[in-house]
């Protein structure tokens, strides 16, 4: 559960309505793989991840980033039940994929950076604070199965 004020909920919702999930999802996942290269081990089937350009232009990275952001978008409509919303994904990433739950936090922080880059001055400190709460809540929900 994420505790947001009315102002924070409005800020998150207003900005998210302008997000191009295809573009932002691919960029966020791509940046995660470039900035934290050890995360690439979970994506060995994606082909060439040998350089930043290869990662950022990889169609499988872009497609999976879109999928990830689609799930995140779904979570935004269930902020009062993030653990329930992400229960299946938590189980998948824990039991089958064995993803280090710290990677969820890293991806959330990368997403905040990408949103700031895309929205510039519109991504005010108030908006950032609200999104930091949301990505922390999502990361916590995804890590729930690990506890």
UniProtKB/Swiss-Prot annotation:
Q: Which residues carry this modification: S-nitrosocysteine?
A: 94
Q: Which residues carry this modification: N6-acetyllysine?
A: 60, 83, 145
Sites bearing N-acetylvaline, chain numbering? 2
> What would be one Gene Ontology cellular-component term for the protein?
blood microparticle
InterPro entries for this protein: Globin, Globin-like_sf, Globin/Proto, Hemoglobin_b, Hemoglobin_oxygen_transport
> Which example biological process does GO assign this protein?
hydrogen peroxide catabolic process
Transport in keyword set? yes
Modified sites of kind Phosphoserine: 45
Q: Where does heme b bind?
A: 64, 93
Oligomeric form and interacting partners: Heterotetramer of two alpha chains and two beta chains.
Return the protein name.
Hemoglobin subunit beta
Question: Taxonomic lineage per UniProt?
Answer: Eukaryota, Metazoa, Chordata, Craniata, Vertebrata
